[in-house]
């Protein structure tokens, strides 16, 4: 069993299980996303994980996205703490086709995740700082 939280230490096993891996420097993309964001995405639920996160991954794999996405969740702080931050903001996406075939890939183009509500002062300030960044 692969420990997804530390997937970068299990590359051989992931490849053996036909899990598609990022084709870019994950650490650099995440660093740049926090330092100089170019994409803030509001809503970290299933649509992001199944659709928008995959678009970001494809763009990063092609070299067209240099800085990772910052996900701003407004509904539930546990989406951020348990669903994103517990896994270093990475996503294991599994798509099942009608014939039963599974496409599995690690989406690692999310640089940061923030619970953004006024009552969460730390998260709110962080999102404001991202919006004030000239790169955005």
Model-derived features: where do they sit?
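Non-transmembrane, aqueous-exposed alpha-helical and coiled segments at domain scale
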Residues: 1-136
């Amino acid at each position: 069993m692969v420990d997804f939280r530390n997937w970068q230490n299990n590359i051989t096993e992931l490849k053996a299980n036909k899990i598609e891996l990022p084709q870019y420097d994950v650490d650099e993309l995440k660093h740049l996303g926090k330092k100089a964001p170019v994409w803030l995405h509001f809503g970290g639920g299933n649509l992001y994980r199944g659709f928008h996160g995959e678009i970001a991954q494809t763009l990063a794999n092609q070299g067209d996205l240099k800085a990772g996405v910052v996900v701003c969740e407004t509904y539930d702080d546990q989406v951020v703490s348990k669903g994103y931050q517990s896994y270093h903001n990475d996503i294991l996406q599994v798509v099942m086709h009608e014939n039963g075939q599974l496409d599995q890939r690690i989406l690692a183009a999310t640089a940061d995740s923030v619970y953004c509500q006024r009552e969460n002062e730390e998260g709110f300030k962080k999102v404001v700082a991202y919006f004030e960044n000239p790169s955005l």
